[in-house]
Amino acid sequence: MRRVLLGDQATPSPHLTAKGRAAPSQPAQAVHVHVAPEAGLAVPDVYFSAGYGHADSWASGGDWVLIEAFDGRWQMPLHLRSVDGGGRDAASPYGYSGVYAHPELTERDVHAAWTATQAALRDLGAISVVLRHSPLVPQAPLLPEHQIVVSGHPTRLVEIPDEETAWSAMEGRSRTAVRKATKSGLVAIVRRADTTDVLGSGSFRLLYSDTMRRRGAAPAYHFGDDYYSALLDGLGDNLLTAEVRGDGGFVLAAALLLQHQDRLHYHLSGSAAGAVRTGCTNLLLWEAIRFAARVGLHEFHLGGGIARDDSLYQFKRSFGGREVEYRMSGLVLDERTYHQRVRARAAILGVTEDALLQFGFFPAYRAEMP
């Protein structure tokens, strides 16, 4: 893990180049690359944290870095991954991070931070960067060169002033499912996760893996022991588990939840085959909302689906809250090398470079067969 610190943050507009080479006549300080992040840096959400980033590196196969400036008012967590043919590229960790820019940063500050960030990434050998922009924390404005990869992707944010208000805000069908589950004897609990929850033989692990297999999920949604162990080690008490048990204590549904300050995130979940009709997942999410209300959390981010009209998003919508939009962007940092890698990938796929670029995947050299 590395933290990239951009310049002298007391200087309003640092003019930086890689490896500390300040441009002539400019009073900028060096770009410093540290072996590990300094302890105590406040992050705006869990997806910016070293604990989460280190865990996600087991899934992404990359090296986690945090680019940070202005005493933490500019933060960009990334994974650096090797690229076939040489070089590396960067991408936000799985989830919701992007580029945090504190609202107090001026336009000049933001411009300086973007300039220094690009220089630092090039110095780290990055050909391109993919950013997963959080709808929950203030984001830096995009540069004109950014390519929009995903826009208008809906996710649900449930605000929790208190339990009664949250219950009233839910759609009737979801409340009915919760009542049905409770009446049939299902019991839900939310607690701090422990080692037994992340073991391969734990209820959550078994249910999640089985659910992903039933849905034919891509390999990126299957996680190994190292990932879960690192997640528990990195987040500690901020990693929670939710369970719903039926007759005989059999676990019908389970989830991992991430806590950060007054916000809860619905991270991963699974359920037993055929158990959905019992209302177990409705009860699980309602218990998470109740837990949040009890301990003083005010937001529960459920994430989204593929589109507004798909069944997963409609299910999450039934818990009330409001829609917030997630987006992804891409930025080419080394045009020459980028196009070399795209041409090489196009040749492997048997298409032209233009056809691969028009396919819409970013970075294009990581695209699968169109």
Regions found by a protein language model. Give the residues of each.
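A conserved beta-strand-loop-helix scaffold within acyl/acetyltransferase catalytic domains
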Residues: 2-85, 133-157, 161-277
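Conserved acyl-donor/pantetheine-binding loop and adjacent beta-alpha core of acyl/acetyltransferases
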Residues: 82-96
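Aromatic (often tryptophan-rich) hydrophobic motifs at membrane interfaces
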Residues: 113-116, 227-340
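Short, high-confidence coil segments that cap the C-terminus of an alpha-helix
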Residues: 62-64, 123-126, 295-297
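Active-site/acyl-donor-binding loops of N-acyltransferases
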Residues: 1-30, 80-83, 142-165, 297-370
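Short, flexible active-site-proximal loops enriched in glycine and acidic residues
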Residues: 86-89, 124-128, 149-151
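A gly/proline- and charged-residue-enriched helix-loop-helix capping module
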Residues: 92-140
